[in-house]
């Protein structure tokens, strides 16, 4: 497990992380969502030591992260970070050289190295690209190349910052398959994304950030609410829970309740007729003000 405990971090005088607590387990996909500027990338860069907190700590499989050169090199073999901008990660002239860079540094060579690179490129749909110049790839192809480099390292944890950005439908399907495969292999995967469809498809646990803080977390979350929280501000309305005065008024359906919740997340005040136990239980999942009449 990777655990961030009470992380604080500043860029100059601006506090970007404000006491963040976060966990990512092996064999699970942990999804991090929130609007731009919420602090997601800053948090992710702490998980393998790319950034050092002002206070707080990061614990990886029971051991607190140390920041000397030797410790960081070991951590980055086990916790691979796929950058939001793949150009920040691509270091070599050709596709083959870039994917081979990490495994070579781990001592792989010959047929074993060839096999690792070949399998990684095949997994991301870049077979046949070995001799291509990285500079000639499209944005989506560069992103898949960055993921291939992660696969070739065979890390215990893989952190993906916005892996679906600039990727077409086929590329997105492939990325989702890769994430699922990593989970099946027992890897811990952390995905930061604005894509609620991808989050719903692959996520096992969800965190939502705003203004440098975790504002919601849970194992299950509505697709529509996740989308709203992922790309909108957290200006919330109110739900008024009222008893129906009409004896034959039908029970509130799940779809109706979800629409009401979405309106509340948009800042509206909505009235929900009926106080069925399931309605009350559903409303307790959301950080909304609920008033009973």
UniProtKB/Swiss-Prot annotation:
Sites where the protein binds ATP: 34-41
Compartments it resides in: Cell membrane
Domain spans labelled ABC transporter: 2-236
Listed InterPro entries: AAA+_ATPase, ABC_transporter-like_ATP-bd, ABC_transporter-like_CS, ABC_transpr_CbiO/EcfA_su, Co_trans_ATP-bd, ECF_ABC_transporter_ATP-bd, P-loop_NTPase
Gene Ontology CC entries for this record: ATP-binding cassette (ABC) transporter complex
Enzyme Commission number, as recorded: 7.-.-.-
PROSITE patterns: ABC_TRANSPORTER_1, ABC_TRANSPORTER_2
Gene Ontology BP annotations: cobalt ion transport
Membrane topology recorded in Swiss-Prot or TrEMBL: Peripheral membrane protein
UniProt KW keywords: ATP-binding, Cell membrane, Membrane, Nucleotide-binding, Translocase, Transport
Domain of life, per lineage: Archaea
EC main group: translocase
Protein family: Belongs to the ABC transporter superfamily.
Protein role: Probably part of an ABC transporter complex. Responsible for energy coupling to the transport system.
Name the UniProt record assigns to this protein: Putative ABC transporter ATP-binding protein AF_0731
Native source species: Archaeoglobus fulgidus (strain ATCC 49558 / DSM 4304 / JCM 9628 / NBRC 100126 / VC-16)
